[in-house]
């Protein structure tokens, strides 16, 4: 099987077909089949395949989709007309998981329908355009679709549906879709709404007249009304001869009076149909849909810009806030105009209420930097106290520590902590400052030390001592002995 893969050219496009039966990962041959791949990708960009079912399943052969009508007789190409086949010598239907274009049985009749093979199908080679292949473990999702139950017409009883096709790699960056997927959805929604409105109006029109209760309902004639249109005379009666006025009046009345025999029901029906047609055309019109989308985007961007400006103004006010009366007045007036604090001020108020409760109770409104400096100062004092406690006698240390604790209780952190605890018993024992860590003496440790402290005796040194021979190393290190030996030789 590996030699079959080796003969196929490299792919340059990739899509993922998201279906109700799972994802199907497809790689496309855009170089070998440019028209088929371009048609498939363009229809995908337009959302043409969204919601389309697999209308044909032949176990052991193919599964087929791409018809929005779901009958197998529909579909259109991106080019507006069927396009020709693209047969390549190295692309053959010799295994499962190959993607091809479906046609109506004749050559060069490709539109939007496609199929995926479930096994080798050599009878399709040189008759259908093969423009892609299934890769990875997603082939098993294709096989699951191929195992569905079908009726006599090879239609699955519960047909799976394509949710959407995601384009991962597009070899043709110059594709400009005729309509976007969002616009297509809006157009279809408008069509359905217009169709529902038309059906409801037809039902209402039929319900108004019930001739079934009359014995002559079928042969009832629609009553006719004579509609007369009269015009007033534009002459002055006091300046015209009476006989001549009567003559002209009768003449003009004959010319101006027109009798139009129009049944009222036909009038209403014609008007309603004209209104329905105009409303449906208006709802489905693509230009109106695009204009509406642009208006919604413009309105959303304007509201977003207004919110950004408002947030910037709030930030400027917070930076300038220094506790002055003018700033407080401007803030209060702006809050009155906004009918409440902004979101940013509310969040800052939450954090301010949680931060430094003891400092707020004592009336201390210093900034965060001052608080950090105070904390560091207290830590330095504490470390200094601990260091001094190790050098002084225990009695003096206890007295100094008690004095320091008394001072802290009078002012500063000790008072704030006392107020905060509200009568809770405080542990004021300061003996731990002079405490020393002492480990229990272990017999095993003493034994180990005794073993390590054994004296090492050199037997050669002991032998020299017994024989009375001098040590060469000692002689080298003592020059007096050397001179004595030399003087002895001279004698």
From Swiss-Prot:
Region (Disordered): 186-427, 464-491
The entry's keywords: Coiled coil, Cytoplasm, Isomerase, mRNA processing, mRNA splicing, Nucleus, Rotamase, Spliceosome
Ranges of Acidic residues composition bias in the record: 391-406, 418-427
Record-linked PROSITE patterns: CSA_PPIASE_2 (PS50072)
InterPro entries reported for this sequence: Cyclophilin-like_dom_sf, Cyclophilin-type_PPIase_dom, Cyclophilin_A-like
Biased composition, class Low complexity, residue ranges: 323-333
Any single biological process term in GO: mRNA processing
Top EC category: isomerase
Catalytic reactions of this protein: [protein]-peptidylproline (omega=180) = [protein]-peptidylproline (omega=0)
Protein origin, superkingdom: Eukaryota
Segments forming domain PPIase cyclophilin-type: 11-167
Compartments (UniProt record): Cytoplasm; Nucleus
GO molecular function term, any single one: peptidyl-prolyl cis-trans isomerase activity
EC number: 5.2.1.8
Quaternary structure (record): Associated with the spliceosome.
Function: PPIases accelerate the folding of proteins. It catalyzes the cis-trans isomerization of proline imidic peptide bonds in oligopeptides. Involved in pre-mRNA splicing.
Protein name: Peptidyl-prolyl isomerase CWC27
Organism the protein comes from: Cryptococcus neoformans var. neoformans serotype D (strain JEC21 / ATCC MYA-565) (Filobasidiella neoformans)
């Amino acid at each position: 099987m590996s030699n079959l893969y080796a003969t196929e050219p490299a792919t340059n496009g990739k899509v993922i077909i998201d279906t109700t039966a799972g994802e199907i990962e497809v790689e496309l041959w855009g170089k070998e089949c440019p028209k088929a791949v371009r048609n498939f990708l363009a229809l995908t960009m337009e959302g043409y395949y969204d919601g389309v079912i697999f209308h044909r399943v032949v176990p052991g052969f193919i599964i087929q989709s791409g018809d929005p009508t779901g009958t197998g007789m529909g579909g259109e190409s991106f080019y507006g007309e069927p396009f020709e086949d693209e047969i390549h010598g190295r692309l053959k239907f010799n295994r499962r998981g190959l993607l091809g274009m479906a046609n109506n049985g004749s050559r060069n009749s490709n539109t939007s329908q496609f199929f995926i093979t479930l096994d080798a199908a050599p009878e399709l080679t040189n008759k259908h355009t093969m423009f892609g292949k299934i890769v990875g473990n997603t082939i098993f999702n294709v096989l699951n679709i191929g195992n569905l139950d079908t009726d006599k017409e090879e239609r699955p009883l519960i047909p799976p549906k394509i949710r959407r096709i995601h384009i991962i790699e597009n070899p043709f960056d110059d594709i400009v879709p005729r309509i976007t997927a969002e616009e297509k959805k809006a157009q279809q929604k408008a069509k359905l709404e217009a169709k529902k409105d038309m059906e409801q109006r037809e039902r209402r029109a039929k319900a108004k007249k019930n001739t079934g209760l009359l014995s002559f309902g079928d042969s009832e004639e629609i009553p006719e009304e004579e509609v007369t249109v009269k015009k007033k005379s534009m002459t002055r009666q006091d300046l015209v001869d009476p006989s001549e006025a009567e003559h002209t009046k009768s003449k003009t009345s004959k010319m101006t009076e027109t009798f139009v025999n129009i049944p009222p029901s036909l009038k209403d029906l014609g008007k309603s149909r004209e209104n329905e047609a105009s409303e449906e055309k208006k709802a489905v019109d693509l230009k109106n849909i695009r204009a509406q989308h642009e208006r919604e985007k413009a309105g959303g961007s304007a509201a977003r810009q207004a919110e950004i400006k408002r947030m910037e103004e709030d930030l400027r006010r917070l930076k300038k806030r220094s506790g002055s009366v003018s700033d407080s007045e401007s803030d209060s007036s702006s809050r009155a105009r906004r009918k409440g604090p902004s979101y940013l001020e509310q969040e800052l108020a939450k954090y301010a209420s949680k931060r430094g409760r003891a400092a707020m109770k004592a009336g201390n409104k210093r900034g965060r930097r001052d608080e950090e400096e105070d904390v560091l100062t207290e830590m330095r004092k504490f470390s200094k106290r601990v260091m001094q406690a190790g050098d002084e006698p225990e009695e003096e240390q206890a007295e100094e520590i008690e004095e320091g604790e008394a001072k802290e209780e009078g002012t500063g952190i000790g008072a704030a902590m006392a107020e905060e605890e509200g009568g809770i018993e405080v542990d004021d024992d300061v003996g731990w400052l002079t405490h020393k860590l002492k480990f229990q003496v272990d017999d095993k440790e003493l034994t180990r030390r005794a073993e390590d402290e054994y004296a090492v005796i050199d037997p050669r040194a002991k032998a020299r001592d017994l024989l009375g021979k001098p040590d060469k190393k000692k002689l080298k290190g003592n020059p007096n002995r050397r001179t004595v030996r030399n003087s002895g030789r001279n004698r």
